[in-house]
Curated annotation (Swiss-Prot):
Keywords: DNA damage, DNA repair, Immunity, Innate immunity, mRNA processing, mRNA splicing, Nucleus, Plant defense, Repeat, Spliceosome, Transferase, Ubl conjugation pathway, WD repeat
Pathway participation: Protein modification; protein ubiquitination
Motif, DWD box: chain positions: 409-424
WD repeats: 220-261, 262-301, 307-346, 351-390, 393-431, 433-469, 478-517
Subunit structure: Homotetramer. Component of the multiprotein assembly MOS4-associated complex (MAC) at least composed of MOS4, CDC5, PRL1 and PRP19 which is related to the PRP19C/Prp19 complex/NTC/Nineteen complex identified in other organisms. Associated with the spliceosome.
Protein name according to UniProt: Pre-mRNA-processing factor 19 homolog 2
Swiss-Prot/TrEMBL catalytic activity: S-ubiquitinyl-[E2 ubiquitin-conjugating enzyme]-L-cysteine + [acceptor protein]-L-lysine = [E2 ubiquitin-conjugating enzyme]-L-cysteine + N(6)-ubiquitinyl-[acceptor protein]-L-lysine
Gene3D superfamilies assigned to the protein according to its UniProt record, in alphabetical order: YVTN repeat-like/Quinoprotein amine dehydrogenase, Zinc/RING finger domain, C3HC4 (zinc finger)
UniProt EC number: 2.3.2.27
Gene Ontology BP terms: defense response to bacterium; DNA repair; innate immune response; mRNA splicing, via spliceosome; protein K63-linked ubiquitination
Taxonomy, superkingdom: Eukaryota
Subcellular location: Nucleus
């Protein structure tokens, strides 16, 4: 007799008085308490309707299939088979769960990467939108391209102003970027074939350098030369002075060719544009001027650029001689088109309180180096205007930057001296410690390095691991104890030094005194 619910032989058998069915006591009592009816017939059923079936108390009844050893073995075999099947099913489920978990983890990782990328793109888009909104003109005006006033200033209608009253720059176009890239490729290829010119002054020659001449080029009431550049093809030296003028000096004849007046404060930087008759000057009056020689020797201001809001410390010309960059204490550097005098891009750093004090193009033109008053040297990708590297280590304001013609070395000057950087590994590999290094300059061949501080030192360049030998120490004869700038002449045949006593001094080999003329021929006031 088996239970009508479980199908097993009941331990405590009971029978329904209504249906006559046999049940296990505990099962039928629970069913009645839950449902109140017979589980088989569905008729109403109570506890009183079930009657226990009594068996002998001494011998318990046994089921037929467990009453013999073969029956027990069969039961055990069935139990074992069920256990194995259940274990196999569990292992299958575990394997499937592991695969699903691995897939879910990969999906989670991919989702995190996508979310991070989307957040970055969102932030960049927001920043770009904010920049565009700042430059959207409040009242659009007609723009006349390349218009200039008779005094050299650009016409007001040339400038589209944003809400913050800053000029909206069009950006560096794809055509210009292609031009810069082509120039870089050509110069890089040319550098691989470059050889040191045989006419380059030897080390023995430099060791015998002495002062050949001295020329007072600027006014006595505001003495001092702040910057200098040399047009090697014509042997003309340009100096920028504290007296707010720039002087063009012909070294072979010892004569002043022209005096450029127009700035209201000291001229902080002066540059020739290739072999052309263009000269750039930057000033503490927050402007940059482009000077042109119409052919009569009298330079006139072609453009006055006032895109900066603080003192302009440096100008540097791109190797194409079509573009240039100015760097200012307002924390920006500007990329200009020389032909139109228009600012194509004005770049600021993401970090706050950055003042640019020096700037120079890499010889290939796609890298720009800038120095700051916060002792940091920053390297920029000109195409994207992105800061790609920075060099820390100086103490005090970075006063000068010079790239070597080999394309690998960068020299920087600051209050703690001069440091040399390897652009391939982005590290400082040598330092020349001296107080208040005002200027540092590689010669055009990259063979020599000049440093202007309390005196003028000339070093022979070498590799990263080799020793850079000191060739010559030239005294600062100004009496001010401050040589402000140093430049090498063509093939390093002479060294030009500017000082705060307004004198331009020429150091060279005795007997080669091309410019040893009377100081009376120069401007005294």
């Amino acid at each position: 007799m088996n239970c009508a619910i479980s199908g097993e032989v009941p331990v405590e058998p009971v029978v329904s008085t209504k249906s006559g069915l046999l049940f296990e006591r505990r099962l039928i009592e629970r069913h009645i308490s839950d449902y109140g009816k017979c589980p088989v017939t569905g008729e109403p059923l109570t506890i009183d309707d079930i009657v226990p079936i009594k068996t002998g108390e001494i011998i318990k009844p046994k089921t037929l299939h467990t009453a013999s050893i073969p029956g027990l073995l069969g039961t055990f075999q069935n139990e074992w088979d069920g256990l194995m099947l259940s274990n196999f099913a569990l292992e299958q489920q575990l394997h499937t769960a592991r695969q699903e978990l691995s897939h879910a983890l990969y999906q989670h990782d991919s989702a995190c990467r996508v979310i991070a990328r989307l957040k970055k793109e969102r932030d960049e888009a927001r920043q770009l939108l904010a920049e565009v909104e700042r430059h959207i003109p409040a009242a659009p005006e007609a723009v006349t391209a390349n218009a200039a006033l008779s005094n050299g200033k650009r016409a007001a209608v040339d400038e589209e102003l944003g809400p913050d009253a800053k000029k909206l720059c069009p950006g560096i176009s794809a055509e210009i970027i292609t031009e810069l890239t082509d120039c870089n490729a050509a110069l890089s290829q040319k550098r691989k074939k470059r050889q040191i010119p045989q006419t380059l002054a030897s080390i023995d020659t430099l060791e015998r350098f002495t002062q050949l001449s001295s020329h007072p080029l600027h006014k006595t009431n505001k003495p001092g030369i702040c910057s200098m550049d040399i047009l090697h093809s014509k042997d003309v030296i340009a100096t920028g002075g504290v007296d707010a003028t720039a002087v063009l000096f012909d070294r072979p004849s010892g004569q002043i060719l022209s005096t450029l007046t127009g700035h209201s404060k000291k001229v902080t930087s002066v540059k020739f544009v290739g072999d052309s008759d263009l000269v750039l000057t930057a000033s503490a009056d927050k402007t940059v001027r482009i000077w042109r020689n119409p052919g009569d020797g009298n330079y006139a201001c072609g453009y006055t650029l006032n895109d900066h809001s603080a003192e302009v410390r440096a100008v540097t010309v791109h190797p194409t001689n079509k573009y240039f960059v100015s760097a200012s204490l307002d924390g920006t550097w500007c990329f200009y088109d020389l032909s139109s005098g228009s600012c194509l891009a004005q770049v600021s750093d993401d970090s706050k309180n950055v003042d640019y004090t020096a700037a120079a193009f890499h010889p290939d033109g796609l890298i720009l180096g800038t120095g700051t008053s916060q002792s940091v040297v920053k390297i920029w990708d000109v195409k994207s205007q992105a800061n790609v590297a920075k060099f820390d280590g100086h103490t005090g304001e970075v006063t000068a930057i010079s790239f070597s013609e080999n394309g690998y070395f960068l020299a920087t000057a600051a209050e703690d001296g001069v440091r040399l950087w390897d652009l391939r590994k982005l590290r400082n590999f040598k330092s020349f410690l001296s107080a208040d290094a005002n200027s540092v300059e590689f010669d055009p061949s990259g063979s020599y390095l000049g440093i202007a501080a309390s005196d003028i030192k000339v070093y022979q360049t070498a590799s990263v691991k080799a020793e850079w030998n000191l060739i010559k120490t030239l005294p600062d004869l100004s009496g001010t104890g401050k040589a402000t700038c140093v430049k090498f002449g063509s093939d390093a045949q002479y060294v030009a030094v500017g000082s705060m006593d307004r004198n331009l001094r020429i150091f060279g080999l005795p007997g080669d005194e091309k410019a040893n003329v009377d100081d009376d021929s120069a401007q005294d006031s």
